[in-house]
Design a protein with these regions (language model features):
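Glycine-enriched, solvent-exposed interface loops adjoining structured elements
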Residues: 1-192
Length: 192
């Protein structure tokens, strides 16, 4: 279901006029979409974010492949910060890497870092673009491919034709609940 269709489904439930055609560009930059429709669009994104966090949806899974470099410990995942790592597999050897704490990685490096096939990974901040970085232990001594299986939330919906990746019904109903709370039609109950 597209972003415009999602907005229209909420508007129908609110007995409001729907958006008859796609807008061009981002919704907030469009002069053809009313302010109220933009509010409903924002509530769709709020609801989408909540639904995405409730489950590890298959449609949100991605694989980030990292090629190691001999003697290099730190790697950039180039995937943003709001991800969940489900599994890490060394595609070269078939071994699964285990997540460890930064404290553990700091402990095992004295007097020098161990070298060999990576068995562990730990988070080590982010780069200037807010992409997560990981340290490997032992430090690789050869080129290997590590596959990080991640859950990554879909970017906020802004374009009319963007298709939602998670189930639409809970997103629609969540946005509708937020909309009736915003209008004061919820009978005084709290909505989240």
């Amino acid at each position: 279901m597209t972003y415009r269709e999602l907005i229209n489904q909420v508007l129908i439930r609110l007995r409001e006029d729907t958006i008859s055609s796609d807008w061009s560009g981002a919704i907030n930059d469009s002069s053809t979409v009313s302010a109220y429709h933009k509010v409903i669009g924002a509530l769709i994104n709020d609801s989408k974010r909540s639904i995405e966090s409730y489950h590890d949806w298959l449609n949100l899974r991605e694989t980030v492949s990292v090629s190691t470099v001999s003697g290099t410990k730190n790697y950039n995942l180039s995937s943003g910060q709001e991800i969940k790592i489900v599994d890490v597999i060394n595609a070269t050897t078939g071994m699964h890497l285990n997540q460890v704490s930064k404290v553990y990685l700091n402990t095992v490096k004295y007097p020098t870092d161990d070298t060999g096939e990576p068995l562990y990974y730990g988070f080590n901040g982010s780069d200037s673009s807010n992409n997560l970085k990981v340290d490997l232990s032992p430090v690789p001594t050869s080129v290997q491919t590590l596959n990080f299986e991640i859950i990554k939330h879909q970017d906020a919906l802004t374009l009319a034709a963007t298709v939602l990746k998670v189930p639409s019904q809970p997103v629609i109903l969540g946005a509708w609940a937020r909309a009736i709370a915003e209008r004061g039609e919820d009978g005084g109950t709290q909505s989240s």
